Every structure is written in C-alpha cells, then in structure tokens.
C-alpha cells in the first residue's frame, strides 16, 4: 500500500486560515488534488477537514471514493459509506487498497508522519502568505528525510513539489 500526503499550503506552510478558511486555494490546485484522490480511490481526513470538505460543492467529485475520518471521539459521518477510525493505523486497516491519500488537518498529518506511515508527499504551494493559520504539521517530535521526485508548475503562480519519504 502506498500512502500519499497531499496538501496545498501558503508560502509559509499554512494549510488554512485560523478560522479554517481555505478560499485562497486555487481551482487548479483543487483539480490536481481531486484527480489524485479519485485516482487513488481512497481518502483519509481529520474530522475538521471532513466538516469543511463536505460543505464544498466540489465534494460530489468524491462520490466513488472510499473515505475514512480519523476522530478521537465518536463522530457522525454524513453517509454510511464514510467510515470512522480512531487512529492513523486503524484508518489504513479500513482501506487495504493499493493507494491512499491523506489530507489532514495539521494534527492528523503530523500523526501519520510521526508514525512513519507516509510514503510520498505532494505539496502545492499557493502564492500567499498567511500571518496566522493552521500549520501543515502540528507540534510533534519527528524528523523525516525526503527525496525530491518531481516539481512542476500547476498554474501561473503555483508549483507542486513531489517527495519520497526516506525510510
């Protein structure tokens, strides 16, 4: 199984504003993310990301995607097809397919990296700096070496970096 962390970030590493606003993320980035998720067929998100994502009109693009929400407490999903797990490892056990995309929040992203469960990372850098916001990784005690596999321009002012996590 290949586990891919896929996130859009500001130049200074934020994945959302402090109020969870992600309206600054471009359509081109969304299209790239959506294609990656649909190709993998599996998506793992945190409960806050799930609540944000399911309110987006574009969420209908994921109707055929197996989705797992990682939540520490009991959590109610919108459909029976969306599963709930209480840890990154439990989420992966529910999705034993070839490829899985993880798209946090910062706490979930950090947990997956800390537990050494990520194989590849796609980072789409948006041309914006946010003074306050939610970081790509919440505070955890880890260090991982990466190998750059590819970089490409996904829009006039946006680039995508693709890394392999060295294990």
Language-model features and meaning:
Residues 1-167:
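Enzymes that bind and transform nitrogen-containing heteroaromatic metabolites
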């Amino acid at each position: 199984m290949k586990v891919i962390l896929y996130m859009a970030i500001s130049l200074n590493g934020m994945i959302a504003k402090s109020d969870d606003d992600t309206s600054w993320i471009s359509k081109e980035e969304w299209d790239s993310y959506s294609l990656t998720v649909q190709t993998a067929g599996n998506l793992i998100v945190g409960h806050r990301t799930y609540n944000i994502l399911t309110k987006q009109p574009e969420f209908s693009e994921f109707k055929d995607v197996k989705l797992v929400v990682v939540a520490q407490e009991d959590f109610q999903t919108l459909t029976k097809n969306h599963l709930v797990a209480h840890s990154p490892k439990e989420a992966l056990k529910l999705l034993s397919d070839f490829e899985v995309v993880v798209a946090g929040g910062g706490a979930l992203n950090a947990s997956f990296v800390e537990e050494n469960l990520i194989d590849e990372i796609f980072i789409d850098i948006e041309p914006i700096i946010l003074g306050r916001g939610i970081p790509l990784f919440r505070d955890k005690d880890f260090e991982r070496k990466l190998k750059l596999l590819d970089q490409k321009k996904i829009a006039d002012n946006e680039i995508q970096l693709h890394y392999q996590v060295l294990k």
